[in-house]
Every structure is written in C-alpha cells, then in structure tokens.
C-alpha cells in the first residue's frame, strides 16, 4: 500500500536537519548585521542617514524574498529553491569577503537581505510539511535554533571584528556552505512531498487551489498586523535605544550585553516550551501573553534610568518575543490550506519585514518631535491596541475557524 508523505519516517525531512540549517544560517547572518552600522560608519566613514537607507534596502530585500519564496514554494519543487537560496547566499558572502568597500557593501547587504527572506520563508514552509510533530513544537524548536544561532554569532563577532572583518565574512560564507551541503543531502524528502502535490492535482483530488475561508483570512490579517506593529516598535531597541542609553551615561558595551541577555533568555524559554508544549492552553493564549509582555516592557522603559532597569525591560520584552513570535507562524500554519502554506508563511515574514524596515524611521520621527518618554507610551499603547482588537475577534471567530493540521 502506498503511504502518504509523512506516514513513513524515511520520506519526511528530519527535524534535526532543519535545525542544523537554521543554526548554520543564523550564526552566519549574526556575523553580519551587528557590525554593519559600526563598520560603515567607523571604517568606511558613511553617514548615519545613509546607513539608515542601507538597512532599509536590506529589509525591503527581505520582504521581496519572502513574498517570492512563499509564492514559488506552493507551485514548484522546493528542493532546488532552497539549494539556490543557500548556495547564492554563500557566494555573496565570499564576494563580500573579497570586496567590502563602498558601495559594494550596500549591494551585497541588499542581496543578502533578499536571500535571507527567501531562505527563512522556505525553511518555515518546509517545516509545515512535517507531520510527525505538532506545528507548535516544530516552530518553537526552529525559533530556539534561530536564537541559539544569534547567541553564538553575536558572542563571536565582537572578538573576530577586532582581528579581521574579512575573516568574519569568510567564516559566515563557510557556515552557509555547511547549510548548503546539509540541504543537498538531507532535504531531498521534500521532493516526494512535491510529487504528491502534483499527483493530487493530476488525479483531480486537488485540481484547484483551496481558497482560505474568510474567517481564517481575517484572523491571519489580525496576526500579520500585530506582527508588523510589534516589530515596528521592537526595532527601536536595535536602533534608537542605544543612543538613549548612552545619553544616560550607560557604556555602549552594556547595551550590547542586553542582546546577549535577550538571546540567552529566548534559548532558555524555547527549551522550556519545547519540553512543556502545553504550558499555554492554546496557541492564541501564548500569542496574547507574548504581546502583553511587549506592551508592558515599553511601559517599564518610561522609568528606566540605569542598566538594571533596562535589563528588567529587556527580560520582559524577551518573554514576549520568545512566546509570541514562534506561536504566530504556527497558528498561521494551522489556518492555512495545504495549497497555500508557503504563501502565508511568506506573509508572516513580510509583516515582520515591514515593521523592521519602518521601525527606526517611525521611532526617530516620534522621538525627534516629542522625545523618548512619549515614544515609549505610544509604543505600549499601539501594541496593547493589538490585544484589544485580537481578543474579541478571536472570541467571535474561533469556533468557526477551519484548522488545517
């Protein structure tokens, strides 16, 4: 008897190999983004305003990569798509190692942004094909792996940067080579998954793309809006907050320490969530808890004047990040028909990318006009507003939602 994809453990990608790919690519990526502003400003003498444009282009590239990857995943064999994405990323990083002047660095960073969105969406989409584990567990583990990569990368980059920026780019490229080799040998089962999709269409089982029910679509739009708004505010931790802390007399290396704290807590939290997947009654409860923590974290910033209080704010923020961010793509997966899972995983990346692209600009405008304290209140209120919208919406729709496990 012919078994469907996932019924035989040999014809499904093993979760461990998705973890390896996630780790390698995120360690490599974490060699690049922390040093970009410092390298461009201190080494290449690029103004902060131009650096803002460079980072914006990187985020726009990520958005475009996410959209295209989600579109092609649902329509084509994902195996060559992921190979091309990871392989080209390795090539671009080798080119960055050889040519990292101006404006070449800008070009390479924009391309890596596109490929980062492409690869991230494909990894999440590949995860939706796994049937041996609950979606919540898979996305928690992948988010854990992502942040373990960030912890490792950001810890190493500070030491290697003082030694050689070229070496950093070479090591990042080699990590993507590892991810490429891993994909070549271990992602082949996705070919069978794609073949079954094609056979289903040819046999008439799924001749047409399954439309997403209207209620599911509305709920997903609420999640995407929440992601965009949350990232819009969160990105100010990566940009404007460093200036604020330094203005209060807190050394820059203490600000950097907050990100090590952030990633470490995420790793611990994801380990706990993986060990106790039913800690929250439903994915929606997990999302609401996380978004609530985000709102509270910005309120605590109103009163933060020393490192201890900033660390407390970061801990609260990280509890929100560790719970909400992996739960949203998992819930979106449950709400998405099998013929459009890639599309909607791409949409989660796009929503995040929009928030990341415009966050520093939005925060800078509010801070320039009103100051930091009013911005913290604005951020908290807007994030809390997402909860006010989502809870009654979910209560109205949840019994009528169609779930696609």
Regions found by a protein language model. Name each.
Residues 1-12, 189-225:
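Juxtamembrane intracellular "pre-TM" segments in multi-pass secondary transporters
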Residues 8-59, 219-259:
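Helix-loop boundary and gating motifs at the non-cytosolic
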Residues 92, 103-112, 308-316:
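Paired small-residue
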């Amino acid at each position: 008897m012919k078994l469907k994809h996932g019924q035989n453990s040999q014809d499904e990608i093993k979760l461990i190999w998705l973890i390896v790919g996630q780790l390698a690519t995120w360690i490599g990526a974490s060699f690049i983004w922390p040093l970009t502003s410092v390298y461009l400003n201190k080494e290449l003498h690029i103004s902060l305003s131009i650096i803002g444009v460079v980072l914006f282009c990187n985020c726009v590239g990520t958005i475009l990569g996410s959209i295209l990857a989600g579109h092609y995943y649902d329509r084509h064999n994902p195996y060559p798509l992921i190979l091309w994405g990871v392989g080209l990323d390795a090539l671009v990083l080798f080119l960055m190692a050889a040519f990292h002047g101006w404006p070449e660095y800008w070009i390479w960073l924009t391309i890596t942004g596109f490929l980062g969105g492409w690869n991230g969406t494909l990894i999440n989409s590949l995860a939706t094909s796994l049937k041996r584990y609950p979606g919540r567990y898979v996305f928690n583990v992948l988010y854990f792996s992502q942040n373990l990569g960030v912890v490792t990368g950001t810890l190493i980059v500070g030491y290697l940067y003082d030694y050689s920026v070229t070496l950093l780019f070479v090591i990042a490229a080699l990590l993507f080579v590892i991810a490429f080799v891993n994909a070549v040998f271990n992602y082949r089962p996705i070919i069978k998954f794609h073949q079954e999709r094609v056979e289903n269409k040819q046999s008439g089982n799924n001749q047409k793309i399954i439309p997403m029910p209207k209620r599911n679509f509305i709920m997903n739009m609420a999640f995407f809006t929440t992601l965009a708004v949350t990232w819009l505010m969160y990105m100010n931790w990566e940009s404007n907050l460093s200036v604020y802390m330094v203005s209060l007399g807190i050394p820059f290396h203490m600000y950097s320490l907050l990100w090590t704290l952030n990633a470490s807590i995420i790793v611990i939290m994801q380990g706990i969530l993986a060990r106790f997947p039913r800690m929250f009654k439903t994915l929606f409860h997990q999302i609401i808890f996380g978004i609530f923590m985000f709102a509270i974290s910005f309120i605590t910033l109103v009163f933060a004047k020393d490192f201890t209080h900033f660390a407390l704010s970061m801990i609260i923020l990280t509890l929100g990040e560790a719970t909400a961010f992996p739960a949203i793509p998992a819930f979106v997966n449950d709400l998405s028909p099998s013929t459009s899972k890639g599309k909607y995983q791409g949409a989660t990346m796009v929503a995040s990318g929009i928030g990341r692209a415009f966050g520093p600009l939005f925060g800078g405008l509010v801070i320039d006009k009103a100051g930091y304290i009013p911005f913290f209140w604005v951020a908290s209120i807007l994030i809390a507003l997402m909860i006010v919208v989502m809870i009654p919406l979910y209560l109205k729709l949840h019994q009528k939602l169609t779930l696609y496990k």
